[in-house]
A protein has these predicted regions:
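Hydrophobic alpha-helical segments and helix pairs
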Residues: 145-182
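Coil residues (strongly favoring Ser/Thr
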Residues: 59, 82-83, 95, 147, ...
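Bacterial Sec-dependent N-terminal signal peptides
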Residues: 1-32
């Protein structure tokens, strides 16, 4: 009889666990929070310091954003090319891009406000469209090529396209009317 009761308790426990029924003790999973990976800082660490650990993270941990940046956004080659990381380093060593990277780091020391906005937006979206998957969000510097990258479950934000309409480098590459759309990322539209 004790064996049956023990088995019954184990089966009921397994049933509750597999069905996700909460016991009310705070074991339920928190809603998914968005945290923006500072891919731009990781890439800059590689470019400026020739950091092997940063290169490993780019190629192993963040393979997809690296492939998208190199092949689609910058179009400087393929990730399979043996010299692609030297080419990437040379590309971002251009004096204009060095200034751009420095300005982006000064303007966006952290992305707390962006993360708050993304979390608020995705909470609203999930209410309207249940089952919506939250993408992996990262920041990058696209050399003025793209504003937003959206591929599968990735969302890339090119911070260099959100420096504010009066940003001096925009004047060199864009017409005045184009600069109007290059607002600071935390400004309301």
């Amino acid at each position: 009889m004790k064996l049956r009761i023990s088995l019954l308790v184990i089966l009921i426990s397994m049933l509750f666990a597999s069905c996700g029924i909460s016991t009310g003790k705070g074991t339920e999973q928190k809603e998914e929070e968005i945290s923006v990976l500072r891919y731009d800082k990781l890439l800059n660490e590689y470019v400026r310091s020739n950091s092997f650990s940063a290169m490993q993270k780019l190629t192993m941990d963040y393979r997809q954003p690296t492939k998208i940046l190199i092949e689609d956004v910058l179009a400087i080659g393929t990730v399979k090319d043996d010299t692609i990381f030297q080419r990437l380093q040379k590309f971002y060593s251009d004096t204009t891009l060095v200034r751009l990277v420095s300005d982006v780091e000064a303007k966006f020391p952290n992305l707390d406000e962006v993360e708050k906005g993304l979390n608020k937006g995705f909470r609203k979206l999930k209410k309207e469209v249940p089952g919506t998957k939250v993408p992996f969000v990262y920041s990058q510097i696209s050399a003025f090529n793209e504003s937003i990258i959206l591929v599968d479950t990735l969302l890339g934000i090119s911070l260099d396209k959100y420096m504010g309409e009066d940003y001096p480098l925009y004047k060199r590459f864009y017409y005045d009317y184009q600069c109007l759309s290059l607002i600071h990322i935390s400004e309301p539209t």
